Curated annotation (Swiss-Prot):
This is Ornithine carbamoyltransferase 1, anabolic. Its main location: cytoplasm. It comes from the Bacteria. It comes from Pseudomonas savastanoi pv. phaseolicola. It catalyses: carbamoyl phosphate + L-ornithine = L-citrulline + phosphate + H(+). Belongs to the aspartate/ornithine carbamoyltransferase superfamily. OTCase family. GO terms for biological process: arginine biosynthetic process via ornithine; citrulline biosynthetic process; L-arginine biosynthetic process. Homotrimer. Signal peptide: none annotated. It is an enzyme of class 2 (transferase). Its EC number is 2.1.3.3. Carbamoyl phosphate binds at residues 53-56, 80, 104, 131-134, 259-260, 287. Reversibly catalyzes the transfer of the carbamoyl group from carbamoyl phosphate (CP) to the N(epsilon) atom of ornithine (ORN) to produce L-citrulline, which is a substrate for argininosuccinate synthetase, the enzyme involved in the final step in arginine biosynthesis. It holds the Pfam family OTCace_N. The gene is argF.
Amino acid sequence: MNARHFLSMMDYTPDELLGLIRRGVELKDLRIRGELFEPLKNRVLGMIFEKSSTRTRLSFEAGMIQLGGQAIFLSHRDTQLGRGEPIADSAKVMSRMLDAVMIRTYAHSNLTEFAANSRVPVINGLSDDLHPCQLLADMQTFLEHRGSIKGKTVAWIGDGNNMCNSYIEAAIQFDFQLRVACPAGYEPNPEFLALAGERVTIVRDPKAAVAGAHLVSTDVWTSMGQEEETARRMALFAPFQVTRASLDLAEKDVLFMHCLPAHRGEEISVDLLDDSRSVAWDQAENRLHAQKALLEFLVAPSHQRA
């Protein structure tokens, strides 16, 4: 299969990724100015959701509509995948009917197997390992507010989860230093750490991670599928709550990001999203525009670019 996919930040070169987030800024500006731009007219995106989502569905569906195309939502119950059809068989059929497929799933291997058997681009809308579309939005948001992130320091506070893994990949591709503050036993995937080398540092003190940082980011302490661990995680992660006082330790122009949904009073203080240093709402909106840039890159013929 010759289709180009987006399963990981490592699938593209640093220049390609930078081009995507810059294109996201341009497409956002087109939308603000009310200019019609429909390079994906008559194109159809299939969206397979094994994990539910608000932002992922809205951003991809609205993005396809804004670019002139359409999106079809499929829950796990709506396909034969939910009844035991092999992933490879589903991929071969769906990719004959669609122009691209976005999958939000649990096991990352579901994505890689689907992509290996697909004629059309496959996009990782989230897996247990990675969340690369969110990192496109995060990098676009930093670019809009502060310019290049190259050489900056980013602090990730909390669970070494899929978002943290994607931040590690972003540190490699966008050339910034990443400090990860997490409890022992909740570190990010060692394979990603090995790939990043000296770009990533694991610390146990969240204050040390935040000190002098240009960007601070976090996520929920208990992800989907981990509900039975909630009580234990709440106790272990309590010292890792990000607050306004936390941001006071960072650079004066620090930005705070959260991929949302946020649990106010848990991983963040109740008032943090309302702090002037928080750009979480811009970050959420930029899922739409960064993913439009990705869809255009993967699906639209080059001669249709504005």
